Amino acid sequence: MQSEYAGTPRLRCRRRRLSHGEARPGSARTRPLDRPEGVWTEPDLHLFPQDGHRYEIVDGSLFVAPPAPRWHDDLVGAVVTTLRAAAPPGWWVCDRLGVAINQGVSAGSNLVPDVTVLRPRSSGATWSDPADVALVVEIETPATRRYDRMLKPTLYAEGGIRAYWRVERGPVSPTLSVYELGPGGFRLRERAEGAEPIKLDTPYPVRIMPSAWA
């Protein structure tokens, strides 16, 4: 699932994916941004400069996150490596693959999780359908703490995504919080940190040792 353009995630995930607005080496945009007259929509994400910020749309409103620190990208890579090593044939583990949530209360939302796991025989849409998504993972930073703890899990739950992981950096070892979808939204199932491994069965059997991500 290789992305050829920062604003259009595609169904290939063999190498690191550019986030919305993340610059390719040597690239630049100089034309002014044309603001929409109404709500923001997915095509508007193509208008932004590739300056390292992450641009997402929530219910037609624009949300912008500052460029992530290097340790964040290192953690994303470590989580992807763990999930790919355990993935059964046919599953896709993607970093920064867009998800379009266009149902329920959250109609008109385009989100970019740090890590996305897609089920076999996924639709292949430019923006993934939540029905194809088995797991989303967010790596929390100081700038995205409230966003990753409150708003984005609510939207993922409204889209029907069954599993959500949140990873915090921690002073010694990352901490993994594992959530599963219940009747009222996501509920905490397990929390792990340090060198004590845990075994999870969602999205597929996988052994996690958070200290290995440090």
Walk through the language-model features, giving the residues of each.
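Gly/Pro/Ser/Thr-rich low-complexity, intrinsically disordered segments predominantly at protein N-termini
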Residues: 1-214
